[in-house]
UniProtKB/Swiss-Prot annotation:
HAMAP family: UPF0266. Pfam families: DUF986 (PF06173). This is UPF0266 membrane protein YobD. One of its GO terms (cellular component) is plasma membrane. InterPro entries: DUF986. NCBIfam families: PRK02913.1 (NF002791). It is found in: Cell inner membrane. Its main location: membrane.
Length: 152
């Protein structure tokens, strides 16, 4: 096993740990989930570039008769990238004392101001940061509003 294979195993393990955390552990942290809303995906250009580069590496490894283990590891990396970028749905998860947005815990008392833009983006102003929450279904904004009013 080469150092390349070890690095690939490390990246695959990191992506797998992230996927498991995002899917199973994060919804169970900080109490029961009150509301979970699907968000719009960000630009997919980065993901196309990543999966494309891995596909080029697979092709290069196969045509140069590289190690079969490396080909399998690159394929697993491409599949993990495909899952994380295209199959997994980004979500905002509301709890009793705060919410998870982009895998970051934010307590409700950190929200200084909230606005709704004309194109349906909920803007939350924190102390030093602005969150742009783009929901997939525009009707979910009303659910978020009701939940925030109940918990304030």
């Amino acid at each position: 096993m080469t150092i390349t294979d070890l690095v690939l195993i490390l990246f695959i393990a990191a992506l797998l740990a992230y996927a498991l955390y995002d899917q199973f552990i994060m919804p169970r942290r900080n109490g029961p989930t009150l509301l979970s809303i699907a968000l719009l995906r960000r630009g997919r250009v980065d993901s196309v570039i990543f999966v494309g580069l891995v596909a080029i590496l697979i092709y290069n490894n196969v045509t140069s008769h590289g190690a079969q283990m490396t080909t399998w590891l690159l394929s697993a990396l491409a599949l993990m990238g495909f899952y994380i970028f295209w199959i997994r749905t980004p979500r905002i998860i509301f709890k009793q004392r705060g919410f998870f947005f982009a895998n970051v815990w934010i307590e409700y008392n950190r929200i200084k101001e909230m606005n709704l833009s004309e194109d349906g983006v909920l803007v939350m102003q924190l102390e030093q940061r602005r969150l742009l929450i783009r929901v997939r279904n525009i009707n979910d904004l009303e659910k978020i509003y009701k939940l925030l009013i109940e918990n304030q």
